[in-house]
Amino acid sequence: IDYTFVSQVNNNLISNAIRYATSKVNITYTSNNDGFYLSVSDNGCGFSKNILSKATNPYFTEEENHSEHFGLGLYICKILCEHHGGYLKIKNCSIGAKVTAFFKSLD
């Protein structure tokens, strides 16, 4: 597993969760024979239904101020996961959202 990729995705997902959380962020790391899972969830407002499918598109952001956030974070996370044979999964929870990154083992 390329830990540079994992670190980049980790930092981005945590940064996003902190930005949108009301007060709580959960981070879970799991590994098995298939690979490595990184899940980050928050208790923010989650993704609206029409946004959920667009969240990993390049340059997509809900924020009106594009000077700080260019809408590339989740897109880059998705590309890094896919480059490593994995995926990025985004879902809404009863409160907030959860993003799971999977990196396939290269063994």
Predicted regions and their residues:
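Conserved micro-motifs of the catalytic ATP-binding
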Residues: 1
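Detector for a conserved hydrophobic position within an alpha-helical segment of the HATPase_c
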Residues: 80-81
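Short conserved segment of the HATPase_c
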Residues: 47-60
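Short alpha-helical Gxxx[C/S/T] motif in the catalytic ATP-binding
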Residues: 73-77
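Acidic ATP/Mg2+-coordinating residue in the GHKL
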Residues: 42
